[in-house]
Amino acid sequence: MRRARKDVVITSPYLIPGPLGITAFEALGQRNVKTVVLTNSLAATDEPLVHTGYSRYRRQLLESGVDLYEISPERTRRTKRLGMFGSSFGRLHAKTAVVDGHTVFVGSMNLDPRSDTQNTELGIFVDSPALAKELLRIVNISKLQSAYRLRLDSHGNLEWLSMDEDNETIFTDEPETSFWLRLHNMLISPFLPEQLL
């Protein structure tokens, strides 16, 4: 990511950037590198506790200029467009990055502390504009048809937006989740050590 000059597009099912990751995203923003991240929403993840680690950083990611998208199980089921990029449950599984429209990373590594320090992960970088173009096409379809776009409102609160045809729907709570799941994650979050998520 440090070598990016114009754009970076990342998919990661589990995203916990930590302070160093936030610094890297902020540096991209300061260099006017367009950064897009697609990850799982709370409704889509199979690890709600890991999602608490990610949710700590959403505001900072948005403030640093990241275009942030979260996969929606309901929107995915309706469009049936995630295909090999995810699962039939409307969950992101791909771990990819495209830098400047030609360098592609595909691997098993999430952007989280476990992948960095505890798990054995691997990945490959390929310089292929054709592969990058196809991967970007799939990501663009996914983010437009199968994901919520996140933003901050005028008071700095999170909003999730979905576009269906000509209609924009705005959610102020994590979409497709119950009050109880959100409460559980909010209460347990302060006690979860980030390096174990």
What are these regions (language model features)?
Residues 1-7, 193:
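Secondary-structure "cap/kink" motif recognition
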Residues 15-197:
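PLD/PLD-like phosphodiesterase catalytic module centered on the HKD motif
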